[in-house]
């Protein structure tokens, strides 16, 4: 089965992201707005049990932190994806690193760019128009991160929470 690890932002940020995703993200219905910490990976029952134990340990050792979103950005020219750019901070980078070392495979296909996708799979003209409009809008979003989620993928390709891990606690 496929699993992944993500942070779900507050309802305020999810609502703002979803207002755009409904129109500009064909995968809108598959997963709520999120910040991916670890891309999808395969795990069987035994591996999953070990993964959950390791995630508990990492969560306990990680203190909650704040994230800041001040603008939109893009992965152009690689893809026509537009996202809320999460300002990189040490705590977030450390959490990401812990999920790609030790008992975890380093399955990264790209450098870690903390973000919340708001538009993807756009035609070039639409991409340029939307990006230009969103770059003129001011964004000043802050969130308190005190947990992350282990997700699994269903047969219809949607993702659902398997378990939540609260930071700084058993």
Curated annotation (Swiss-Prot):
GO molecular function: hydrolase activity, acting on ester bonds
Transmembrane segment boundaries: none
Active site: 34, 115
EC number: 3.1.-.-
Span of the annotated motif HXTX 2: 115-118
Coiled-coil residue spans: none
Motif HXTX 1 per record, residues: 34-37
Domain of life: Bacteria
Pfam families from the UniProt entry: 2_5_RNA_ligase2
Enzyme class, spelled out: hydrolase
Keywords for the protein's UniProt record, in alphabetical order: Hydrolase
Cross-referenced PANTHER family: PHOSPHOESTERASE SAOUHSC_00951-RELATED (PTHR40037:SF1), PHOSPHOESTERASE YJCG-RELATED (PTHR40037)
NCBIfam families: PRK13679.1
Protein family (similarity comment): Belongs to the 2H phosphoesterase superfamily. YjcG family.
Protein name (database record): Putative phosphoesterase OB1230
Species for this entry: Oceanobacillus iheyensis (strain DSM 14371 / CIP 107618 / JCM 11309 / KCTC 3954 / HTE831)
């Amino acid at each position: 089965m496929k699993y992944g690890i993500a942070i779900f932002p507050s309802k305020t940020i999810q609502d703002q992201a979803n207002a755009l995703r409904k129109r500009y993200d064909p995968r809108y219905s598959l997963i709520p707005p999120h910040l991916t910490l670890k891309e999808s990976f395969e795990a069987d029952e035994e591996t999953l049990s070990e993964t959950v134990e390791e995630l508990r340990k990492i969560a306990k050792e990680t203190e909650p932190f704040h994230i800041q979103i001040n603008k939109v950005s893009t992965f152009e020219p690689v893809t026509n994806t537009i996202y809320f750019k999460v300002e990189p901070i040490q705590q977030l980078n450390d959490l990401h690193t812990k999920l790609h070392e030790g008992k975890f495979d380093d399955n990264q296909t790209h450098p870690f760019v903390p973000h919340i996708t708001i538009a993807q799979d756009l035609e070039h003209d639409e991409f340029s128009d939307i990006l230009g409009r969103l770059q003129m809008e001011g964004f000043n979003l802050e969130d308190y991160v005190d947990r992350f989620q282990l997700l699994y993928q269903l047969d219809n390709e949607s993702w659902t929470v398997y378990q939540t891990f609260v930071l700084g606690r058993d």
